[in-house]
Amino acid sequence: MQTIFKELTKSFEETLLESLIKNEKKEEFEKIRKNLINQASKEEFGDYQCNICLVLSKIYKSNPREIAIAFIETLKENKKISNLCENLEIAGPGFINIKLKNKVLIEAIKSNIKCPRAGVPLSHKNNIYSKKKVIVDFSSPNIAKEMHVGHLRSTIIGDSISKIFEFRGYIVLRLNHIGDWGTQFGMLITQLKDLYSSDLKEIDRIKISDLVEFYKASKKRFDNETEFQKRSREEVVQLQSGDKKSIEAWKLLCNQSRKEFDQIYKTLNIKIKERGESFYNPFLKSIIEDLNYKKILIEDQGAKCVFLDGMTNKEGNPLPLIIQKKDGGFNYATTDLAALRYRFTKEPYGDNAARIIYVTDHGQSNHFAGVFQVAKRANWIPKDCEVNHVPFGLVQGIDGKKLKTREGDTIKLKDLLSESVKRAKEDLLKRLENESRFENDDFVLNTSKVIGIGAVKYADLSQNRITNYQFSFEKMLSLNGNTAPYLLYTLVRISGINRKNNMTEEAINLESISYSHDLEWKLIRKLLKFDEVIISIEKDLMPNRLCNYLFELCKTFNRFYDQVPILKGEIDTKISRLTLCALTEKTLKLSLELLGIETLERM
């Protein structure tokens, strides 16, 4: 209902300025007009609410209800508002409850049925985003290390945010900032050369069966063998200087890891462009030079750093963001600054981004706050551009502690996904047996995979990303509650109704639709909130808003399905109700796609 909302807001603003806001108060009005109208907090309050009279009462030192009475009388004289609104009434100390006319809602439903996007508008093409990109930096595993549950959160939250921006019409660049550079490669390459010295001439033939064990063995030698440690440090210098054999060994390690990552991305159906830390190596020196030139960089105890405004240590002293270590080496902050500057730089010398979104765990919040502050002070973030950190909490076990194996190790992501699919298959086979129903192996395998992977994704996305959440296969695979199986089952139910009744868009006669049942209007109002939910996520980057909306939509539809005789009554009544089924199906399918969850025709 964004179109209605905008029209309503504009009319309210015009009426306020014409009738209540005196010239000397217009500057104050500009500060408060942003949230002039909001969605009603409860259904009984109508469709929207306006609390401006409470705010104005403080400015004018007047009774808010008296202001509301005068405002409503003026609003009723506005033709646009009288065409949109069935009722305007005062509630409580001075709230104005707004209820839209039924005919306005029906016209909106007709429009959404015809719209392949279920009423969600494309972003405006005449603004900064018409040529510039939105960059979403997510997933970002490290070479020679296994992807774990922390990478799951970054990967699926980042994927969903990317999908929502793409759906809105933005040019989105999904970047995988993998950890493919750093001092750890010295020990890995040294270990590689020690184990496969004779094969390095034919490096493509080397297969490292278990990179994680290879990493652990390398680390153990580095911690315990002085001579190996010395050679590893020398290897880092050779790698950074571009030694041919070192580069080849480094590429081998990256390629082996990439195969592992790609298997998981295939399972999760994730599309992402790899651009690792190494890509920014040529730009690191210029970061130091630019910060020096702008007199932002300070040398402290041999290291070059920027002291951050408003960020202090326990002693109350300003925190430093170290840009270059005292040994001359660079670190994550240097690379992140180089990446940020490159991404905002215009093409062909950069990505030409208008907005950059980083999806990482909340443990990196201070790091990114420091990086963003330095970038702003260096004027690397254009005035009309935006940068956001999207932090998320930990995945915990049902005991409330960090999710680990029984042995205390971090759970591998591929093992977790396999276990979910396995349990989904077991549940499906039990259900088929209870229903005395036979399905072939392809059906069982595909359905198990869709439910198992979808359940893991949805369980994560449905949480407020900022908080920790407890991982439970039992809860996420349940057919009851706010779960992927519940949504998928509801969608299968609706799709079956529409298939049996040939409810294609071409078959719907929109001119004859009409509604009278209370549950019809509840479903209509829920369906018309879809665009507002999507646009709100674009602003605050909280995908759980879409999950909450879908759960409420499914509950509303199921009450409608159970209590309203959809296929009975006169033909116009039947078509009107089937029209709501068709729009619910479309909205559910689009939404699940935005969450990265595949759908099923049968379960």
Curated annotation (Swiss-Prot):
The keyword Membrane does not apply. GO terms for molecular function: arginine-tRNA ligase activity; ATP binding. A motif ('HIGH' region) lies at residues 141-151. CDD domains: Anticodon_Ia_Arg, ArgRS_core. GO terms for biological process: arginyl-tRNA aminoacylation. Signal peptide: none annotated. It is found in: Cytoplasm. This is Arginine--tRNA ligase. The lineage of its organism: Bacteria, Bacillati, Cyanobacteriota, Cyanophyceae, Synechococcales. The gene is argS.
